[in-house]
From Swiss-Prot:
Alphabetized InterPro entries for the sequence: UPF0114 (IPR005134), UPF0114_bac (IPR020761)
Species of origin: Helicobacter pylori (strain P12)
Identification of the protein by name: UPF0114 protein HPP12_0190
UniProtKB keywords: Cell membrane, Membrane, Transmembrane, Transmembrane helix
Transmembrane segments: 15-35, 54-74, 102-122, 145-165
Gene Ontology CC annotation, any one: plasma membrane
Amino acid sequence: MLEKLIERVLFATRWLLAPLCIAMSLVLVVLGYAFMKELWHMLSHLDTISETDLVLSALGLVDLLFMAGLVLMVLLASYESFVSKLDKVDASEITWLKHTDFNALKLKVSLSIVAISAIFLLKRYMSLEDVLSSIPKDTPLSHNPIFWQVVINLVFVCSALLAAVTNNIAFSQNKAH
């Protein structure tokens, strides 16, 4: 009897995630606001904006879009996996969610982080002259911020590759059984 009560209480705690999911949807509102603000800035300066600044603005918009997609993916998958099934929604609209298990979600999150990091690096590359001009010429490589950003991006890439390989090995072993 005590065991069943404990199990019921533990299972009911999943609903504590629901307010967090709702709060996380506010992050989408903030990202949407930042996206529209950047888009408005780009459009309002269309006559005077340089090609480099236009590309940087576009990369910023892509970055915000990727981030919003990542938040939405984690939000929906978390709710679906841990709180309750999304049964009031047209199933054709969220078919990817039905086929997304925890390992697939980890892989998608890893790949999204790599993409966001790569966009950040590309934005830095577009302003490379400004960055390099602010660093003294005799600065060691370990003190160069671009060096560390590339290293961090490579860590993200290696982590995503390792997650993909691990997922593939685990999936092939489960398939064999």
